[in-house]
Amino acid sequence: MIDRRGSPKTPAGGLLGDTAFRDYSSKLQAFNAFAEPELRRAIAALNLAPGMHVLDAGCGTGEALAWLHEQVAPNGTVVGVDLSAAHLEAARDHLRPGVTILQADLLGAPLPVQSFDFIWCVNTIHHLREPLQGINRLASLLRPGGRIALGQSSLLPDMYFAWDARLERLTNEAVRSYYRERYALDERDLTAVRGLLGLLNRALLQRVTIRTVVIERTAPLRPADGAYLHEAIFRQTWGARLRRYLSPADYAELSALCNPGHPQFALRRPDFHFLQTFTVGVAEI
C-alpha cells in the first residue's frame, strides 16, 4: 500500500519540473540496475546496524529500500519517500515486512522530527530549488547522533567516447544547452551538484566526510550496463532533442554511435570505456 497522506494537492514544480505526475521510472530502474554493485558497496560501508530506523529520501523506484533493509534487519525499518506516484508504484515490488513507502514532497512529508537513525538521499537534493533547506529539513528528522548520507552521481563529467573527446565535449555542451532552455537554468544551476561538501558544511552538521568512487565499465558489457547506457543515456537523455545543438555532421556521428543497428554502435566497440563518478557525503547531527 502506498501512503499518500503527504501528497500535495497542487504539486509545485521542482528545479527540473518535478511534480507528483513526473515519471522517470524506466531511467531510475536502469540506473539502479547498472550501478547496483557500487551502490550496494556504498551502503555496506556505512556500517548500519540491525534495529535502526532508516529513511530513503527520494527513494524513486525503490531498489535501495531492499538494500538498506538488509543492513538493519531483522527488527529495523525503512521508509521510502518520493513525490512521484509512478515511482512509488514501481517501488511496490520492493516492499517487505519492515519497509513502507510514502508519497510526499520532502519538505512537507508528514514525518515526526527525530524519528530516524539514518537518512539515505541519492540524486535527489539538487532537484529542490533550495537544497540547503532540504538538508535542514532532513536533518530535523534525525535523532541525536543520527547520520545523513547524500549521494550524487557525476560530480565530474562522464566519459562515454574515450576515443573521441571532442564529440564527447560537444555532446555534454549540447545537453547543458538543452537543460538551460528547457528549464530556464543557468550554468551555476547545472553544476551545483559539485557543491555537495559545501552544502553539508553550510547545514552546520558534524563530522562531515566525503568519498568518491568511479563506476567503470568496459567491453564486453553486462546486459544491465548496456540497457542503462543505451536507453537512459543515448535515447532518453540525448536522442533527437540534441539535434538543434549540434552541427549536422556531429549529430550524424553521434546518432551512429548511439544506434544499435549501425556498424559504429559505441557499445559494441572493443575499446568502449565508460567512467562515471559517484560521491557520498556523510554527516552527523
Regions found by a protein language model. Name each.
Residues M1-P50, E63-W67, H87-A90:
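Conserved class I S-adenosyl-L-methionine
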Residues D3-R4, T10, G14-Y24, L170-T171, ...:
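C-terminal helical/coil "lid" or tail adjacent to the Rossmann-like core of SAM-dependent
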Residues L55-A57, T61-A109:
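Class I SAM-dependent methyltransferase SAM/SAH-binding core
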Residues G108-F118:
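A short acidic, Gly/Pro-enriched loop at the edge of an enzyme's catalytic core
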Residues D117-L132:
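A short SAM/SAH-binding and catalytic strip from SAM-dependent methyltransferases
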Residues L132-R147:
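A short glycine-rich, Lys/Arg-flanked "PGG" loop and its adjoining helix->strand segment in the class I
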Residues L150-L221:
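Conserved catalytic/acceptor-binding region of the Class I
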Residues A203-Q206, Q276-I285:
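Core SAM-dependent methyltransferase catalytic element
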